[in-house]
Structures are given as C-alpha cells and as structure tokens.
C-alpha cells in the first residue's frame, strides 16, 4: 500500500479529530504525547501525520505535501484553494457571527467598520446583503475592537459565546455554521485512489454510525 500523509491542525480541532481517526483504526497515540514534534507515524499502518497551523493545512494539501487534510470550513471559505473537499466530519461545529456592544445598531444606514480575521468572508457576506462596509483586518483578539472604538462590530467564529460574554459583546447576526472538513490533494486522489477512498469510506461510516 502507498504511504498516506495527513495534515492536521494544531489547537481547537485537534481534540475533536484525533478520536475519529482512532475509531477507524488509525492509531494516534503519539499525537497525544507529542511534545514539540510535528511529524508522526501511525503504528502498524501506512499513514503519517503532520501538525501545522490551521491556515496552512489547505496549502500543504494543495501543493501535495499532504495527501489528506482536516481543516475548518472557515479556512476553506476564506482562502480559496485548489483541493477537493470530501467529507463534513461534523465535529468542531461553531458559527460565524456578527457581534458588538449592546448599543450597536445593525440597521443603521451609516457605513460601518467591521473588524475581523476573515476579510474575504466578511466582505462577501455584507456585499450579498447590499451593505457597504469598511473591513479592518485584525490578527489577534477581535473582541476588543468595538470596546475601544476601532470598529462598530466584529465578525468572528463563535463556539460557546463565553468570550463574547466576558467582553460585554452580544451576537446580532448568525451568518453560517462551520465544521471540520476532510480535504484531498487532486493529484493524490488519482495516484492513491484506493488508499484515500478507504480512509474516506471508513470515516463516513463512522460519522453515520455516530448520528
């Protein structure tokens, strides 16, 4: 069997995705006690894992460094990559939301300033609504932007809403739901078709059995 390299995201999705691979018989013991390592071999299989930042997973898959990747739908929406999106894993579910301080008026005709880590998604959303907004890209915590007057509102991913609540913000609009997706390199799907579809089929069966 040909070797398969899978790119996973470090952080939020990691805790949801590793159990899925274990349930379909792909050992991930080294991922649980990884230290500073970023490349791991699954024992007794032809599969290895690489751990990278979420924004880089699709890039590694697009360029063929990884055959398969698991990444949030937010990354695929923000950064359009030449890959195949194969499976909605149904984990890491959260929502894109417009949030601000309680006095924010979403119906105001004044041009709004929106702070976000996701300028493409935000611009598309407001454009589709027919609203002209100024997008301010923020790399760190966006919750502070309305509090300091940098922006009228923010667009961000909301999982529990706890961070918003702690900063005195509330959700005004729910834009869309997102979750973890399995993506595949286009060339690998041809050259390693059997190996890749074996993983995909097992994952789909596991997801269906868990519903």
From Swiss-Prot:
Its EC number is 2.4.2.17. It comes from the Bacteria. GO terms for cellular component: cytoplasm. The keyword Hydrolase does not apply. Pathway: Amino-acid biosynthesis; L-histidine biosynthesis; L-histidine from 5-phospho-alpha-D-ribose 1-diphosphate: step 1/9. GO terms for molecular function: ATP binding; ATP phosphoribosyltransferase activity. It is found in: Cytoplasm. One of its GO terms (biological process) is L-histidine biosynthetic process. Keywords: Amino-acid biosynthesis, ATP-binding, Cytoplasm, Glycosyltransferase, Histidine biosynthesis, Nucleotide-binding, Transferase. Pfam families: HisG. The keyword Cytoplasm applies. Its main location: cytoplasm. Disulfide bonds: none annotated. InterPro entries: ATP_PRibTrfase_cat, ATP_PRibTrfase_CS, ATP_PRibTrfase_HisG, ATP_PRibTrfase_HisG_short. Lacks the C-terminal regulatory region which is replaced by HisZ. PANTHER family: ATP PHOSPHORIBOSYLTRANSFERASE, ATP PHOSPHORIBOSYLTRANSFERASE ATP-PRTASE. Heteromultimer composed of HisG and HisZ subunits. Catalyzes the condensation of ATP and 5-phosphoribose 1-diphosphate to form N'-(5'-phosphoribosyl)-ATP (PR-ATP). Has a crucial role in the pathway because the rate of histidine biosynthesis seems to be controlled primarily by regulation of HisG enzymatic activity. Belongs to the ATP phosphoribosyltransferase family. Short subfamily. This is ATP phosphoribosyltransferase. It comes from Bacillus mycoides (strain KBAB4).
